């Protein structure tokens, strides 16, 4: 397990490679990541680094959080996230209040991005589960977009849990793995990732080094 960063989704754009091909990218703002707490296996039972990003007014946080930030000597942040790391990865340069910048990710490396997906509201089975529509005519009068049978009759006489049906779509925690880092802007604290990531503009996301890519190596 390695250290990650807290980011904010700025939006999507495209950049051109040297060969002239267009690459769609998502821009994430990962600036001002500050260390709030350093956990060790001896004291806390496991090793981790707790980070915060953004800024929040003091009257908008609880007294417990206010004291937590004060002990670290950092300004109150909007988001707090804990990243589990190996004990030997905690070096002497990592101290409370120090900033972690985007340089921990290299161009061409792979990352996993977690966030809350865009909520779509109440959706049918075609949009939610990729079901197919029935015939538009030729014997079909009122069953064009219905899901079909959802269970048996008297035995068992119920709908099994997990049955794909209509319901709320989106608005859940989602992770996309093995996203390529196309560009890193150390001056503005931006990272450009190939393709899309969960959430809408302004949403908070968490970026970690790719788990699957690390296992392959």
UniProtKB/Swiss-Prot annotation:
GO terms assigned for molecular function: rRNA binding; structural constituent of ribosome
Disulphide linkage map: none
Superkingdom of source: Bacteria
Stretches the record annotates as Disordered: 131-155
PROSITE patterns, alphabetized: RIBOSOMAL_L3 (PS00474)
InterPro entries xrefs: Ribosomal_uL3, Ribosomal_uL3_bac/org-type, Ribosomal_uL3_CS, Transl_B-barrel_sf
NCBIfam families per the UniProt record, alphabetical: L3_bact (TIGR03625)
Subunit structure: Part of the 50S ribosomal subunit. Forms a cluster with proteins L14 and L19.
Positions carrying N5-methylglutamine: 154
Low complexity: compositionally biased ranges: 132-145
PTM description: Methylated by PrmB.
Keywords of the record: Methylation, Ribonucleoprotein, Ribosomal protein, RNA-binding, rRNA-binding
Function: One of the primary rRNA binding proteins, it binds directly near the 3'-end of the 23S rRNA, where it nucleates assembly of the 50S subunit.
GO biological process, one term: translation
Similarity-based family: Belongs to the universal ribosomal protein uL3 family.
Protein's UniProt keywords contain RNA-binding: yes
Gene Ontology CC terms: cytosolic large ribosomal subunit
Gene3D superfamilies referenced in this protein's UniProt entry, alphabetically: 3.30.160.810, Translation factors
Protein name as catalogued: Large ribosomal subunit protein uL3
